[in-house]
Amino acid sequence: MKRVSIELLEREASTKGDKKSKRKEGLVPVEIYGKGVQNIHAYMRIKDLAAMPHGTTFLIEAKLGNEVLPCLLKDIQYGWLGDNPVHVDLYNISNVTETDVEVPLEFVGTPKGVELGGTLEIHLHSIELKVDPRNIPEKITVDISNVDLGGVLHVKDLNIPANCRLMEDPEEVVLVVAEPEETKEGEEEQAQEAATK
């Protein structure tokens, strides 16, 4: 799993005006909470937040004073325009042995069915797993090159690491390679003709 190191700045109880002033300085308020630990109020640099990986799971090593806290990114709240972070929640995993996480799926290869004119329809882009937070997989790689026309890939078909517990319905559909419309129409016409004979 990827690790990202950030440095936090201590934050005393502050007013709305104080927080607004800090945002102008390139800082965003952070709340750190977790099992059996005291909540911590801090600030982090917005540029550090922007530099964090996207589309993968990662561990944050948050340095506050002389202490380094292992954390997961739980939530980012944005302003009404949707592009300005106004608050960040980090989950301190120091005392956690298992946690639920969303792990992204990475699809590799071109399905056989797509090469034959089918359409790839992806229903799930991530799955929920229960795992030791220190061993969270960055992603689950899924080879879809053998999925044929009309083929369906279910959650149970995924290669889940042995140290993870699946929290999804095994029968849930991950993706489908739909047949071309003309093929469907032709099959329907044949069925209608057969029914009238």
From Swiss-Prot:
Molecular function GO terms recorded: 5S rRNA binding; structural constituent of ribosome
Superkingdom of source: Bacteria
Entry keyword Acyltransferase: no
A Pfam family the protein falls into: Ribosomal_TL5_C
Matching HAMAP family: Ribosomal_bL25_CTC
Function: This is one of the proteins that binds to the 5S RNA in the ribosome where it forms part of the central protuberance.
Stated name of the protein: Large ribosomal subunit protein bL25
Gene: rplY
